[in-house]
């Protein structure tokens, strides 16, 4: 449009010059020439009118194009305002994300504290397990000693029983009245034992009822807990859904639609701008001063840009150093993990060896149980022999009564000579009886020793069972320790993998930065090429300007348009300054984030060091436990050797006793022969009368013999009662063994359940770790987005530099046009009239080309702004998604913490249940049973709370020796 106006003015100047020439020709030339000139001027006027019409049409077209370009510029301004608002929203979201990251770090710190407390608890449990293993081993040794002593006592009792049987077979004559007394004694002992047994059964049933009631209460409480946990989970899921809906709603309803009022405001602004076009020409000089100020500010911005680039280089160097440090730390961790794996393998081998030893011990116990069964069978046989001996004793008593009657008859017929022989024989019998009494005393002492040894064997058996339980608990705790170490190894491996992934990400970032640097260099080279092209175009335009010297008025219009463009560019510069300030703030935030990441890396290093120390301490404790176990094994082996020696000694003693028993049998046989000879002599002397003195002496001797027989019978009853008590102890030990086996099975099932729960916990922890890993990846993606924003900032700076170059070019054009105007004013225009239309046509073409270039530039800027707007919207949506996912992660972590608390509570409840056997022992303390029986009953209860079958009814006839009579008063 400016060029057209300039051409119009040049045409008017040409008209004036032609008029002046015509006037000069009128005054100088003839009228003929005046007519020819008139015709020529008329033709020129017609041509000029046609040109004016064409110029007016072109002016209208150009005005319409200018209006369209102005509208597009207003649209661009609105788009830029929206982009600034979106950038502010993004800035706010970044602040929120930083706050959320801080909260997440605090949560991770609390989680690490909880894990440390769990490790401490596990160590305490390991120490308790070690103590229990020691006690179990001691109890095992005691049980073994008791078992061996019981075997020796049983053998001694068998020997004593044989001795007594032989003595009873020697005693022939006694009263038949003693039969009923012995049966009464035997029957008297059995109902007392039955009553005590019934009382213990009643107490056991009451205790089991209480335990079952407590189990029902615990199950009800667990059901209530499960219901409350399900309600909490449902509410948490509803909260997560509401948060996601709110985030999507905020993301969708952030940009309100434009209204018709905005369009009306735009039309008003357009009218106002059209009115102020003429007034803005005067303010060109002021704008030039402003342009100078802007140049200074741009130089300052470029200096700041250089400083920022220097800071970025420093940060890259710091990153290189950090990567090297992380690589060193990863290598150390790899070495430590290998060392821990070797240690784990050693511990597993030790564990397998301990299992083998326990299997061997179980086999030995089974062998001992088989021996006990054999001994029980032998005892039953001995009892049968006792019954036979009792019948023989009764027969002997009847024979003694007959002998007394015969003696009374013989007293009347025996002589003094026979009496003297009988006296000598009776003295011999007395001596033999005294020897038998001494042997009985020795046997009583041996019986008391056997009783003491039986008590010791029972105590040793109880200690052995306790040691077995402690060993089993220690093995289980060792399994738990091995599993904990394996989980720690897995965690260390995961951490090493995470560090390797961080290294890979850092390498990728370095590659991206290097690619960005290469792209920047390429862009610089392309910018230099564009500069050269622009210089060429400038040269061409200068040539054109030389040709357009006559278009001074057109240049003035161009100045006005340039002032308008300068004002617009100033507005754009202001907006770019705002963008620069915002991006500087973003850079500062990114630096703060980098500092926070460095602090996190240091914290992770400290945590890794702490974990290493904890692992070393645990390994030391395990080594100490191993040494203690080895020492205990050595002590157990020494105790076993001593018990074997004792067993050999007891066997020797038994052999000696057997020899003594054989000797006593021989002496009894001799006495029997003597008695037979005495009976024959009495029969021979029956015919002869015996004096009163000999008769009285014989009566005395028979009374002493009867007393000796009664004492022997009492000793026999004591021996039978002791054998019965030993049999009861054996039955109780067998029942105790069965109960212990049931408890061991229950413990194994409980351990399996606990292992399953631990596996579930490990799965939950792995899921939480994966979610944390995904969240870290998302944080890295956010960092990459920050880097992209930095790149966009750099590209914006480059765009500003390009605009500065365009401003400089426009200013140079302005100065050149001013100089041309001054030159035109000084020099007179002596151009011919004919070539004017050609120059005007050339001006039109150049103006059209310039307008096309401006339109293309405007379209390119519009497309670039639209792309930026789309990118910003996508970033906003992505940030909304990240917030939703972060809330979901937070909820998942809270849920996992609740589940961990629940599992802790369940473990504490199980520990409390494990304390119930002690309570049961206190309840059953005041029982009337023997001390060994009390301990066995308390141990038989266990902590499982499972009712066991009552003891089987014993056939008392086997032990009492009473026949199953239908009509007797004793049945």
From Swiss-Prot:
One of its GO terms (biological process) is regulation of protein localization. The keyword Coiled coil applies. Its main location: other. GO terms for cellular component: cytoplasm; outer dense fiber; sperm flagellum; sperm head; sperm head-tail coupling apparatus. Expressed in testis and more specifically in ODF, the sperm tail specific cytoskeletal structure. Also expressed in epididymides and brain. It comes from the Eukaryota. Residues 37-69, 117-229, 282-325, 355-680, 706-827, 879-916 form a coiled coil. InterPro entries: PMF1-bd. It is found in: Cell projection, Cilium, Flagellum. Keywords: Cell projection, Cilium, Coiled coil, Flagellum. Required for normal spermatogenesis. It functions as a scaffold protein that attaches the sperm head-tail connecting piece to the nuclear envelope, thus maintaining sperm head and tail integrity. May also be involved in the general organization of cellular cytoskeleton. This is Polyamine-modulated factor 1-binding protein 1. It comes from Rattus norvegicus.
């Amino acid at each position: 449009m400016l060029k057209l106006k300039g051409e119009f003015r040049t045409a008017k100047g040409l008209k004036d010059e032609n008029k002046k020439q015509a006037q000069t020709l009128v005054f100088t030339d003839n009228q003929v020439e005046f007519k020819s000139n008139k015709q020529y001027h008329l033709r020129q006027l017609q041509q000029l009118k046609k040109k004016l019409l064409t110029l007016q049409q072109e002016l209208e077209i150009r005005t319409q194009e200018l209006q369209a370009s102005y509208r597009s510029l207003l649209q661009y301004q609105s788009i830029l305002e929206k982009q600034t608002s979106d950038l502010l929203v993004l800035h706010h979201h970044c602040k929120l994300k930083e706050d959320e990251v801080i909260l997440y770090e605090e949560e991770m710190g609390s989680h690490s504290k909880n894990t440390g407390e769990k490790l401490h608890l596990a160590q305490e449990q390991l120490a308790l397990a070690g103590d229990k293993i020691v006690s179990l081993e001691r109890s095992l040794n005691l049980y073994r000693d008791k078992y061996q002593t019981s075997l020796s006592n049983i053998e001694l009792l068998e020997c004593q029983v044989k001795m007594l049987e032989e003595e009873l077979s020697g005693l022939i004559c006694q009263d038949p009245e003693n039969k009923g007394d012995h049966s009464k004694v035997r029957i008297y002992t059995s109902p007392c034992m039955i009553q005590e047994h019934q009382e213990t059964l009643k107490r056991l049933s009451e205790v089991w009822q209480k335990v079952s009631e407590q189990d029902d209460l615990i199950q009800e409480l667990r059901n209530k807990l499960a219901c409350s946990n399900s309600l909490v989970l449902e509410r948490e899921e509803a909260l997560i859904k509401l948060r996601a809906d709110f985030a999507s709603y905020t993301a969708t309803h952030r940009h309100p639609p434009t209204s018709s009022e905005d369009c009306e405001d735009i039309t008003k602004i357009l009218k106002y701008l059209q009115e102020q076009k003429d007034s803005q020409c005067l303010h060109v000089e002021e704008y030039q001063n402003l342009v100078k100020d802007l140049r200074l500010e741009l130089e300052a911005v470029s200096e700041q840009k250089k400083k920022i680039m220097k800071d970025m280089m420093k940060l890259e160097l710091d990153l290189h150093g950090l990567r090297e440090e992380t690589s060193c730390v990863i290598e150390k961790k790899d070495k430590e993990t290998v060392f821990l794996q070797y240690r784990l393998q050693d511990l597993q081998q030790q564990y397998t060896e301990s299992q083998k030893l326990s299997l061997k011990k179980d086999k030995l116990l089974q062998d001992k149980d088989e021996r006990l069964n054999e001994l029980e069978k032998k005892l039953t046989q001995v009892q049968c022999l006792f019954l036979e001996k009792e019948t023989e004793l009764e027969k002997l008593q009847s024979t003694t009564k007959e002998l007394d009657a015969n003696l009374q008859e013989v007293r009347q017929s025996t002589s003094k000579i026979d009496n003297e022989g009988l006296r000598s024989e009776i003295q011999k019998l007395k001596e033999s009886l005294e020897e038998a009494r001494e042997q009985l005393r020795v046997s009583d002492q041996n019986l008391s020793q056997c009783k003491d040894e039986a008590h010791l064997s029972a105590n040793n058996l109880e200690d052995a069972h306790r040691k077995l339980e402690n060993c089993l608990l220690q093995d289980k705790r060792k399994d738990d320790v091995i599993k904990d170490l394996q989980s720690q190894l897995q965690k260390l491996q995961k951490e090493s993998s995470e560090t390797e992934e961080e290294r890979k990400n850092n390498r990728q970032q370095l590659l991206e930065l290097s690619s960005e640097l290469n792209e920047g260099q390429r862009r610089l080279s392309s910018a230099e090429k564009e500069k050269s092209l622009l210089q060429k175009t400038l040269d061409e335009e200068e040539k054109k300007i030389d040709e357009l010297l006559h278009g001074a008025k057109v240049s003035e219009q161009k100045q006005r348009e340039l002032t308008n463009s300068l004002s617009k560019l100033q507005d754009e510069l202001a907006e770019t300054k705002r963008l620069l300030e915002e991006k500087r703030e973003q850079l500062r935030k990114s630096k703060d984030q980098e500092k926070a990441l460095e602090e996190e890396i240091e914290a992770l290093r400290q945590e890794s060091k702490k974990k290493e120390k904890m692992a070393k301490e645990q390994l030391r404790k395990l080594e100490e436990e191993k040494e203690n176990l080895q020492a205990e094994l050595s002590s157990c082996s020494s105790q076993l050797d001593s018990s074997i020696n004792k067993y050999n000694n007891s066997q020797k003693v038994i052999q000696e006793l057997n020899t003594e028993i054989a000797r006593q049998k021989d002496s009894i046989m001799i006495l029997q022969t003597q008695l037979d000879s005495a009976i024959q002599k009495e029969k021979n002397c029956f015919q002869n009368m015996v004096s009163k003195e000999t008769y009285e002496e014989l009566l005395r001797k028979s009374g002493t013999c009867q007393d000796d027989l009664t004492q022997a019978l009492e000793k026999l009853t004591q021996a039978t009662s002791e054998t019965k008590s030993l049999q009861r102890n054996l039955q109780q030990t067998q029942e105790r063994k069965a109960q212990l086996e049931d408890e061991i099975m229950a413990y194994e099932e409980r351990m399996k359940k606990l292992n399953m729960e631990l596996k579930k916990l490990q799965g939950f922890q792995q899921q939480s770790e994966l979610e944390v890993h995904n969240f870290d990846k998302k944080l890295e993606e956010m960092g990459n987005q920050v880097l992209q924003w930095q790149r966009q900032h750099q590209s914006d700076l480059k765009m500003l530099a390009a605009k500065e170059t365009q401003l400089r070019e426009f200013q140079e054009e302005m100065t050149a046009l001013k100089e041309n105007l001054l030159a035109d004013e000084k020099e007179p225009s002596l151009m011919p009239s004919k070539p004017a239309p050609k120059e005007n046509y050339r001006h039109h073409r150049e103006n059209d080309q310039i307008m096309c270039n401006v339109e293309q530039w405007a379209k390119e800027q519009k497309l670039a702004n639209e792309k930026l707007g789309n990118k910003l919207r996508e970033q906003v949506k992505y940030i909304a998604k990240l917030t939703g996912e972060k809330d979901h992660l937070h909820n998942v972590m809270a849920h996992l913490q609740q589940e961990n608390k629940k599992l802790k509570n369940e473990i504490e409840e199980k520990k409390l249940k494990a304390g119930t056997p002690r309570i049961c022992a206190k309840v059953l303390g005041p029982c009337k049973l023997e001390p060994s029986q009390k301990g066995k009953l308390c141990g038989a209860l266990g902590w499982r709370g499972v009712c066991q079958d009552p003891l089987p009814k014993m056939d008392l006839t086997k032990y009492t020796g009473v026949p199953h009579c239908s009509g007797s008063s004793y049945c």
